Amino acid sequence: MEQVFAIGDPFTIKPIRLRKDRVQRKGTGRRSRTATLQKAGRTVGSLPLVGSEMKYADIAWDATLRAAALRHRVGEGGWTRPVITLEDIRTRRREKKIGNLIVFSVDASGSMGAARRMEEAKGAVLSLLMDAYQKRDKVAFIAFRGQQAEVLLEPTGSVEQAYRRLKELPTGGRTPLASGLEESHRIIRNQLRKDPDTRPILLVLSDGRVNAAPDGMKPMPAALEAARRIAADGRTHSLVIDVERQGLVQFAMAKTLSEGLEADMPFIRELKAHGAQVDAASLKDIL
């Protein structure tokens, strides 16, 4: 039997910390720091000029002058000005903030209705959507229940659309986690093909009670196989948000999933910034 739960109270999210990498990206936003070839962002160092193309080079003059001075030798006639050569040229190494693609993969199975887990999970998703709006992220929304996952929203900048899908999302049926992960990975791969500068974040909200899988496979091994494929790809930062209530009997399946994804695993309450509440006016402005 399906049931539509209300959305729980939203809250301010703690910053999501991503591992730094050396990939140079373009884009705008307010979440993740990334290396960039654009002449924007803060200077964090310098590099020797690659090739001999000076026309569009973002020259770091201070580092260039230091390199020329270190190479310079005082002649017999005394001090002379250093001569800058091509080998002295240094370019700026810059970092800037960009938005991310945040893929929400939400467990909407019947077990999420127990202890009003779905109400709390919806509140967490709304909080994360509000944070995504402020950070200028794109979002995608997948729900898994019954026998398979359903893509409720392809990547978009419209948080309002995601909110509507969240509000209407029913709960019921089995937990096809493997299907949810496979659809998430498909969306991420497609977006990376369209825009290689995308930096994806996968947020899986589940109690981990997996009990449905493709024909011929056991549920948890199928889910772990899908999780390991995402981890092996290496381009996605994943979090498994455990909706099981701490202090109750726990099955620790979410922990097993997080290990397969090589993901962090916060409980919902651990996402909350201390002492920060969301007021109704802020919510109305966003939605």
Residue spans of the language-model regions?
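Short hinge/gating elements
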Residues: 38-53, 106-111, 147-150, 164-167
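Short beta-strand-loop
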Residues: 138-168, 187-193, 217-218, 247-259, ...
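C-terminal helix of von Willebrand factor
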Residues: 257-287
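Short hydrophobic alpha-helical runs that function as membrane-insertion/retention elements
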Residues: 140, 237-240, 264-269
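Acidic/polar low-complexity segments with low predicted structural confidence
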Residues: 1-99
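Von Willebrand factor
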Residues: 65, 95-155, 171, 178-183, ...
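VWA/integrin I-like adhesion module and closely mimicked acidic/polar interface patches used
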Residues: 209-260
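Arginine/glycine-rich "motif VI" loop of SF2 helicases in the C-terminal RecA-like domain
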Residues: 130-134, 193, 228-236
